Swiss-Prot record:
Enzyme class: transferase
PANTHER family: LIPOTEICHOIC ACID SYNTHASE, PHOSPHOGLYCEROL TRANSFERASE I
Species in which this protein is naturally found: Salmonella dublin (strain CT_02021853)
Catalytic reactions of this protein: a phosphatidylglycerol + a membrane-derived-oligosaccharide D-glucose = a 1,2-diacyl-sn-glycerol + a membrane-derived-oligosaccharide 6-(glycerophospho)-D-glucose
Alphabetical UniProt keywords: Cell inner membrane, Cell membrane, Membrane, Transferase, Transmembrane, Transmembrane helix
GO cellular component: plasma membrane
InterPro entries: Alkaline_phosphatase_core_sf (IPR017850), DUF7024 (IPR054288), OpgB (IPR020881), OpgB/LTA_synthase_biosynth (IPR050448), Sulfatase_N (IPR000917)
Keyword Manganese recorded: no
Family as reported in the entry's similarity comment: Belongs to the OpgB family.
UniProt-recorded name of the protein: Phosphoglycerol transferase I
Metabolic or biological pathway: Glycan metabolism; osmoregulated periplasmic glucan (OPG) biosynthesis
Sequence intervals crossing the membrane: 1-21, 26-46, 77-97, 108-128
Gene3D superfamilies tied to this protein: Alkaline Phosphatase, subunit A
Amino acid sequence: MSELLSVALFLASVLIYAWKAGRNTWWFAATLTVLGLFVILNITLYASDYFTGDGINDAVLYTLTNSLTGAGVGKYILPGIGIALALVAVFGALGWVLRRRRHHPHHVGYSLLALLLALGSVDASPAFRQITELVKSQMRDGDPDFAVYYKEPAKTIPNPKLNLVYIYGESLERTYFDNDAFPNLTPELGALKNEGLDFSHTMQLPGTDYTIAGMVASQCGIPLFAPFEGNASASVSSFFPQNICLGDILKNSGYQNYFVQGANLRFAGKDVFLKSHGFDHLYGAEELKTVVADPSYRNDWGFYDDTVLDEAWKKFEALSRSGQRFSLFTLTVDTHHPDGFISRTCNRKRYDYDGKPNQSFSAVSCSQENIAEFINKIKASPWFKDTVIVVSSDHLAMNNTAWKYLNKQDRNNLFFILRGDKPQQETLAVKRNTMDNGATVLDILGGDNFIGLGRSSLSGQSLSEVFLNVKEKVLAMKPDIIRLWNFPKEIKDFTVDRDKNMIAFSGSHFRLPLLLRVSDKRVEPLPESEYSAPLRFQLADFAPRDNFVWIDRCYKMAQLWAPALALSTDWCVSQGQLGGQQTVQHVDKAQWKGKTAFKETVIDVTRYQGNVDTLKIVDNDIRYKADSFIFNVAGAPEEVKQFSGISRPESWGRWSNAQLGDEVKIEYKAPLPKKFDLVITAKAFGDNANRPIPVRVGNEEQTLVLGHDVSTITLHFNNPTDANTLVIAPPAPVSTNEGNILGHSPRKLGIGMVEIKVVNVES
């Protein structure tokens, strides 16, 4: 209703101003600004909804604050371009419409009415309401009900008798199991659901609506609210350190806790969370690649579900045989938005809806088949009688290719339990949320019936039953939940551990690299990983007076304030203000101790803008002084004009990538020498090893032969035509996820370059 009202007010404002208000520059600017704000808010809502399926929520702040890198970004480029073009077009059209009758005399009354209607349209828009609620949740002091309802469970289960298998189905919400809406979509897993305790009304609350948040909610009984933004949890060394979560209780009760997934464990800090709360055995993409049958059988996120669940079965079988009490948690990935992935072992690889194939539905049908096969293996084993199996979605599906059909239904998360010791079939329609999952499991295992804000749905009362406005209530508790982190509010002394790549201050530890925004009462960590914007881009958004401490590889800050370190991959510490003074210190000891020293200085706007402009230079445009092309740092030597066909820098160098260009091309500003040696330090990938690799300069071609290990080879060139471009053409680029960023499409690798040097040998 508010959406229709806001649109009606918007149109009324446009029409009244365009036809009645007349010409006045101030009123035109004010009205266009407010109407433009309405457009921006709604485009922001549309864009956020495209990613989350739930508008502007904490998932947007947490995952999309810094960058979409690592989130299958290629799939969103066209929508992003479309949104940008639409914004430009709408603003242009809006300005043109408002000035249609600019030659008419100005009328203050109609101008004021148009402006008030425009303000009303903004106030009534769902986007403004959502943003306002998020801002309020950041500014509240807390809610007195938090102390009443937050309960810490006993640290042990008195007499544990059952093992636990907990399966998180990525975005596998209960809505998919509605056979009337989606006939025969989930026959195998749906049949298993109907055999157990099926909780049909598991709602999603703020701070529980993406994978790591859903895991925290289900194991700790609290939403994931943190004292920082972005994916900073990937950089912390502990995760809600004061909380007692399900994993802690299981470990204290003698369980060995295992977690198996196909994606990288570091994504969004899952490894940190699990290690902080009782899990000693973690298996992700890196850990599995040496044990799976086919390491090359991967999708954009990691190993397919059939591979992961095969490994989970092996773990279950081995642990059951050992007689050791255990829990085995696993997380699927094939149903990840926007399209999902199809495991090759599925019997059904296609599901049609509305008369055409739908990739997301197909992925769901395939993944549920894999999960059901895993469960049926357990049920058929002699160990099922000692096992509880839990199947839940980590969160509701985000905006995938099935989302518009899901959104027509009453949407709930999936949560059902199969008890080997005590088979029980019942559908429970009690109102609940994902924070209740861990408490319900703990209750079945013989422990307390509460964890944090969660309550057992078998013997307790969920917050979803207590509060009609439970979403608003949880947001009101956000400051209370943030305080559970016990996060430092100041930094004076700090220690950089060069070997462990960590920084410690005020009792907290963070992974490097790291950027800190420091104010009088707050220290905000901003991390860098494959899944966030580079720290220099984040620093460029700081205000001129914002105090910062930046710990990163020296070459990344050298172009600004320490040119002598332009090729150093050591750690450096920079601090200061972008508009004031900055210092750079080289970390030259294993345990390097530093102090913050922020000086009150006069802000130089010109210096600030220069620093910001330099920080925003993209990697390929960075230039440094060197007599060779060093590939493990960003940019290129000053002599290089441009280059293509080369992937991002890694710790050892860079791969050629045929996705970016069929050949490696390095164009120099000036012609290469008439006669020179080309010294190449490199290695080959896959079938490119031990094969002739053409290297061309002008009309002359030499061949390079590389092995899988790094070697240095010198080629001799004559350049009578004064050519200025070096071309290397790997013969057999290999499509692979080797070393790839999680969620990105595979790269096509040919050779790995460490250094290329041109040596003039003209007499």
